[in-house]
Regions:
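A short acidic, Gly/Pro-enriched loop at the edge of an enzyme's catalytic core
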Residues: 94-101
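Class I SAM-dependent methyltransferase "Motif I" SAM/SAH-binding loop
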Residues: 42-46
Length: 156
């Protein structure tokens, strides 16, 4: 994950076509209107974290890249949102209190490099959730990775 140090400054321009508003709207359908304590794992530069905070949720952003989190923190500061951003490996979540929900959007789980790493994340997320809490995540399937993305290059 060290690659995100140099990459952090280029991440948002490269991801400009991601529809973060739709992502947030989709997640909000599951989270509902009640103010929840939510942790966004693999939050990157905080785009989804910020949107869910604006919707009224008590957010924490977690990412392994301090450089990505510095950008996320600056965005939150400019938006006058108080969001703690924590540099840690999502496989070893160490949160101060149980969470109502944990999210890991935009293929964050796909960045884990083994089945064991994924299991560690799911176990850590389960331990960090309140009883009955929600874990919301998405993944790109092996079919998508091999047959849709494959060895294709996507560029403008």
């Amino acid at each position: 994950m060290l690659m995100y140090g140099d990459f952090a400054g280029m991440y948002d321009p490269l991801m400009k076509d991601v529809d973060y508003d739709s992502w947030a709207e989709y997640l909000l359908r599951f989270l509902g209107d009640e103010k929840l304590r939510v942790t966004d794992c693999a939050c990157g530069t905080g785009e989804i974290t910020l949107r869910l905070a604006r919707a009224g949720h008590i957010m924490t952003g977690v990412d392994i890249s301090g450089d990505m989190l510095r950008i996320a923190s600056e965005k939150a500061r400019r938006a006058a949102l108080k969001i703690p951003f924590v540099e840690q490996d999502m496989r070893k979540l160490a949160l101060h209190r149980p969470q109502d929900a944990i999210i890991c959007a935009c293929d964050g789980v796909n960045y884990l490099d083994s089945l064991k790493a994924a299991e560690e994340f799911f176990e850590a997320a389960n331990a960090a959730l309140k009883v009955g809490g929600l874990l919301l995540f998405d993944i790109s399937s092996q079919y998508k990775l091999e047959n849709i993305l494959g060895c294709n290059t996507f560029a403008e």
